[in-house]
UniProtKB/Swiss-Prot annotation:
Pfam families assigned: Pkinase
Protein name: Cell division control protein 7
InterPro entries the UniProt entry points to: ARM-like (IPR011989), ARM-type_fold (IPR016024), Kinase-like_dom_sf (IPR011009), Prot_kinase_dom (IPR000719), Protein_kinase_ATP_BS (IPR017441), Ser/Thr_kinase_AS (IPR008271), STE20/SPS1-PAK (IPR050629)
Cofactor or coenzyme needed: Mg(2+)
Length: 1062
């Protein structure tokens, strides 16, 4: 190893610091070269890592390309390993973005081309970068781009064991899922870096690292910047192919039009000038849009913009000459609409028919009279009355008014008057969308009287609840114009009526007259409310209430007489509490369950007035009436729900939730249901805004109501409990601000205290709430503090949970996964709580949940000595070895075993060196699929470097035969060749028998051939070292004579026959 002496390097100023150490500017006093010195603390690495890193540095010194930072060597001090690198004076592209702003697209394309050239060289040499980002792309004075922090530097940056390795915002999905890094992973990182340079930040930078990792795996591709060219979008979509096997290669990406057409080279100073000018232009255009006088675009007057339909446009100053054919538009449509003569003749015939039909109708007084009676009202009356056909209010609300008591002035305490439950109902009622209610069927639609003809006109009895008779006219399918029957005799359609008319009851006529009188009196009283000269209106309001109590259907007359506005104005004027309460009851009665009337109340300005009575300064009766109105507002239609929210109705709901559940629980029901409804209507109302307003108040009242609802055993409380759970889940699905606002220790403790007592469906919803909350990194310490981990562990092992067990275990396991994934303290607490045997059981029995359980278990060897003690107690090393047969997880499991070997070399080595385990590892490696075995090569090389004993044990003929197959395959990548050579070198150093096995398999010829023919500098260097161990001359290959004689070797005892089952 040709390392630089420490005395030849003088350190200068510090360029940057990190968890691993620091980077300094240095000077090589022997040749005067300025270098960068990366000092890595020896305390941050294991002894086994140190020798490997030194070896790799010596190997990487051979790499030389204009677009990569060159390794100069290394030296070691008492406390640090110093790595000498080429110095790039102008810093990184990340620093350019930070200091000068976004980089223009043409310059990004130029930089990307150079990045890809350097990356292609690394890939051809068998090196995966693993950490491409703007901070690792350096620039020189002449504008050259150089890739830094590849190879050894990447491993050093990841020395903080089991943290988010490298840079999570640039990580490929397969790396996040622990499948392993490949050259395709670098291509994904290139795409993320391009977005970073174009947009200033990488994808998902607004999210916390855990949420970003989740989105990278789940989303089809990261969001692309909106202001880029189509060529740039095409380039990025090639980089963001989800399947790494289908992702484009570096060589092909260099031929993409986006990087080809932007090849104008520029110096660093010119590039900085271009970046500065670009960002100045962006700022200028933004400021112009803000500072520019709005008079040229928006006229701040009442009649600005387009002409109002209520005002005539100004007449032009210059008269416009009228064209000769001013009203003739035939020429305008000539050639676009051709009407045939046949159609025109039919149209003329139809017009003649219509005129004849009208003449017959006008001449017949008998047939026209029913029509005239139906159209006696004006159009406004018809449109108003149509809203009340088959009204659902008449029957249920009739029971509220006792004729023996004064009208509407009695107490409506729900405990004294059970009838009032139909007002504040907790039963869910789905809204009818606006514009659809006219298509809703009524009971009358099922009579089919317009389909099946009858021979007579029936006069039905008067309905008591309306006081009106219903005349049902049924006619035959024959035309009304037929004046004679088949026998030629004139028929009288009213023959059958005479006998039925004799049956009319005089009482019905009296009821009809009485209703007419009451309607007239009601109209008069409403008129008197409008009269400003009347002093006291208390008596008038009482009389209106009395009339309405006599006949509830008369509320239609109030609506048709436009009585809503007088009632609201009177409510504003009158200060007498009894009359105010009576008016509130009147308005609620008229508007109950009728979205049209509710909208009229809102349009008349009544919504803020009605909401004002929900404040605590008013008595229970007033707040109760306000609650009735509020419930109708959010239940009736989407439009009224939007009106309610726009008038700060959410504040009233939050006030209701704060009420005492024991005495005023109806208010709590209204508050909970209202917020639940608002969060469900996400198509109309921004869900995140509602969540923000809810958490800005407090989470305490909601959790207290949850506790009280669980303690009360009735249907309304159970429904309210479910809705509170769903509200909490909705809040946890909002943005990070809302999630962080939910981190209230007392509230979370209250929820966890009742979690095990919730119904199973509500328990699953609440566990989803904690799962979402656990995705915020700032929540981990608090969740650990409130002891959620022992509770989740208990739920996983609770055999009493039967109904919904699968869903509950799934949510609990997902929450435990989020809490433990990146936090060692949480992992240790889970281990102490008894999670290991439960996770093992899940992995064995349930393949669906294995995706969550196994990563938790695989992280534990690096969690600390306490965790490893529990791993030994539960025989987890043997358990991991048994999992090597799973093709989907074998590389991740083998990597975990290698990590455990680094921490506890003697104990783990003893188990792995057992004959059955050695054969198992060799068997798994040799019969695994190509992609999986390639991923295992890197880990196997690490194991052989750490443990010479294991290297000697694994050096058997069967593995060398596998190596030969891979080395002689034409498509073998340089990185695979490098890994194989490193493993063979470690095996030769560990055992002379391995040298004999290598010779027996014919590998020396293969190695010598690659030494001569490979394009990779690193492959050639390793081949030379390997041939020294094999004692093979390094001259030209003699094809007719083997360089060494092959000793007679017995065939291997085991040969792979069939692949392992997954």
């Amino acid at each position: 190893m040709h390392n630089i002496q420490a005395s030849s390097i003088t350190l200068g100023d510090c360029l940057g610091k990190g968890a691993f150490g620091a980077v300094y500017r240095g000077l090589n006093i022997k040749n005067g070269e300025t270098v960068a010195v990366k000092k890595v603390k020896l305390s941050k690495m294991l002894k086994s890592d140190l020798s490997v890193i030194k070896m790799e540095i010596d190997l990487l010194k051979n790499l030389d390309h204009p677009n990569i930072v060159k390794y100069r060597g290394s030296y070691q001090t008492n406390d640090s390993l110093c790595i000498i690198l080429e110095y790039c004076e102008n810093g990184s592209l990340r620093s350019i973005c930070k200091n000068f702003g976004k980089i223009p697209e043409n310059l990004v394309a130029l930089y990307t081309f150079q990045v890809l050239q350097g990356l292609l060289y690394l890939h051809n040499q068998g090196v995966i970068h693993r950490d491409i980002k703007g901070a690792n792309i350096l620039t020189t004075k002449d504008g050259t781009i150089k890739l830094a922090d590849f190879g050894v530097a990447t491993k050093i940056n990841a020395l903080e064991d089991h943290s988010v390795v490298g840079s999570p915002y640039w990580m490929a999905p397969e790396v996040i899922e622990l499948v392993g890094a490949t050259t395709a992973s670098d291509i994904w990182s290139v795409g993320c870096t391009v977005i970073e340079l174009l947009d200033g930040n990488p994808p998902y930078y607004d999210l916390d690292p855990t949420s970003a990792l989740f989105r990278m795996v789940k989303d089809e591709h990261p969001p692309l910047p909106s202001n880029i060219s189509s060529a740039a979008k095409s380039f990025l979509m090639q980089c963001f192919q989800k399947d790494p096997n289908l992702r484009i290669k570096t060589r092909k990406l260099l031929k993409h039009p986006w990087v080809i057409m932007n090849q104008t080279s520029s110096k660093f100073s010119d590039a900085i000038d271009e970046v500065q000018k670009y960002n100045e232009r962006v700022k200028e255009s933004t400021l112009t849009a803000i500072i520019e006088p709005t008079s040229n675009r928006i006229n701040p007057t009442l009649h600005s913009g387009r002409q109002s339909s209520y005002h005539m446009p100004e007449s032009p100053k210059t008269p416009i000459a009228e064209s000769p054919d001013h009203d003739n538009w035939d020429n305008e449509f000539q050639g676009t609409l051709k009407i045939s003569d046949d159609v025109l003749k039919k149209s003329e015939h139809f017009m003649d028919f219509c005129s004849n039909f009208k003449g017959k109708n006008n001449s017949s007084s008998i047939t026209s009279s029913p029509s005239k009676s139906r159209h006696a009202f004006n159009s406004d009356q018809i449109s108003e009355s149509n809203n009340f056909n088959a009204s659902p209010l008449s029957t249920p609300l009739k029971a509220q008014f006792d004729p023996s008591k004064p009208a509407l002035n009695r107490s409506i305490d729900h405990q004294k008057t059970p009838q009032h439950k139909r007002y504040l109902s907790t039963e869910f009622k789905e809204n009818i969308p606006d514009g659809i209610e006219k298509f809703v069927e009524t009971p009358r639609d099922s009579e089919f009287t317009d389909i099946f003809p009858t021979s007579s006109i029936k006069v039905q009895g008067l309905r008591k609840e309306t006081g009106l008779g219903t005349l049902v006219l049924n006619k035959c399918y024959g035309s009304w114009n037929n004046e004679e029957n088949e026998d030629g005799e004139e028929s009288d359609i009213f023959d059958s009526i005479e006998t039925n008319l004799e049956n009319l009851d005089i009482e019905n006529n009296i009821a009809l007259d009485k209703r007419t009188h009451l309607a007239s009196l009601l109209s008069s009283l409403l008129g008197s409310l409008r009269d400003k000269n009347i002093g006291s209106k208390d008596t008038t309001v009482s009389q209106i209430a009395s009339i309405l109590s006599e006949d509830l259907s008369l509320k239609r007359e109030i609506i048709q007489a436009h009585g809503i506005l007088p009632l609201l104005e009177t409510l504003r004027e009158i200060k007498t509490p009894d009359v105010q309460l009576l008016l509130l009851k009147l308005i609620n009665t008229v508007a109950f369950d009728d979205h049209t009337t509710l909208q009229k109340v809102c349009f008349a300005g009544g919504l803020p007035l009605m909401l004002s009575f929900s404040n605590r300064e008013h008595s229970f009766e007033f707040r109760y009436e306000s609650a009735i109105f509020i419930q109708q507002m959010y239940r009736t239609s989407a439009l009224t729900l939007q009106m309610f929210l726009s008038s700060n109705g959410l504040n009233s709901l939050l006030l209701f939730i704060k009420e005492d559940y024991g005495t005023n629980r109806d208010f709590v029901f209204v508050g909970v249901e209202g917020i639940w409804k608002l969060l469900r209507q996400q198509d109309y109302i921004p869900k995140n805004d509602i969540c923000t307003m809810v958490v800005n108040d407090s989470l305490e009242p909601l959790t207290k109501a949850m506790l009280k609802a669980l303690a009360t055993d009735d249907d309304s409380s159970r429904m309210s409990l479910t809705r509170i759970c769903e509200i909490l889940l909705a809040l946890s699905q909002a943005d990070n601000y809302v999630k962080e606002s939910l981190l209230c220790e007392s509230a979370l403790r209250r929820i966890l205290r009742i979690l095990l007592y919730l119904p199973h469906s509500d328990m699953a919803i609440t566990l989803q709430f904690f799962k979402q909350l656990s995705m915020v990194p700032s929540s981990l310490s608090l969740l650990r503090k409130v002891h959620i981990i022992p509770l989740l562990t208990h739920i996983l092992g609770d055999s009493k949970i039967e109904k919904g067990r699968k869903e509950i275990r799934s949510e609990a396991l997902a929450a435990l996964f989020n809490v433990c994934k990146l936090d060692k303290k949480s992992q240790e607490e889970a281990v102490i709580s008894g999670a290991i045997p439960l996770l093992q059981e899940v992995i064995i029995k349930d393949r669906l949940f294995k995706e969550f359980a196994l990563p938790i278990l695989l992280a534990l060897p690096q969690a600390g000595p306490v965790s490893r003690i529990y791993l030994w107690q539960n025989k987890c090393l043997d358990f991991f070895l048994s999992l090597l047969s799973d093709l989907n997880w074998q590389s991740a499991v083998f990597d975990t075993i290698a990590s455990w070997l680094q921490f506890e070399l003697r104990e783990v080595q003893r188990v792995l060196a057992e004959k059955r385990n050695v054969q198992l590892v060799l068997k798994v490696f040799c019969i695994s699929q190509s992609a999986s075995s390639n991923r295992m090569l890197d880990t196997l090389g690490r194991v052989c470097q750490i443990s010479p004993r294991l290297a000697a044990s694994y050096g058997q003929p069967i593995i060398f035969q596998k190596f030969k197959e891979k080395l002689t395959h034409k498509g073998t990548k340089p990185i695979v060749v490098l890994n194989i050579f490193q493993i063979m070198k470690s095996m030769c150093e560990a055992s002379s028998q391995s040298v004999a096995y290598i010779a027996h398999c014919g590998l020396p010829d293969v190695v010598a051939n690659l030494n001569q023919t490979s394009d990779s500098v690193l492959v050639k260097e390793l081949a030379k070292d390997l041939l020294k161990y094999l004692k093979v001359p390094q001259g030209p290959i003699n094809e007719h004579k083997s360089p060494i004689s092959k000793p007679h070797m017995p065939p291997p005892r085991w040969q792979p026959k069939q692949p392992l089952t997954q």
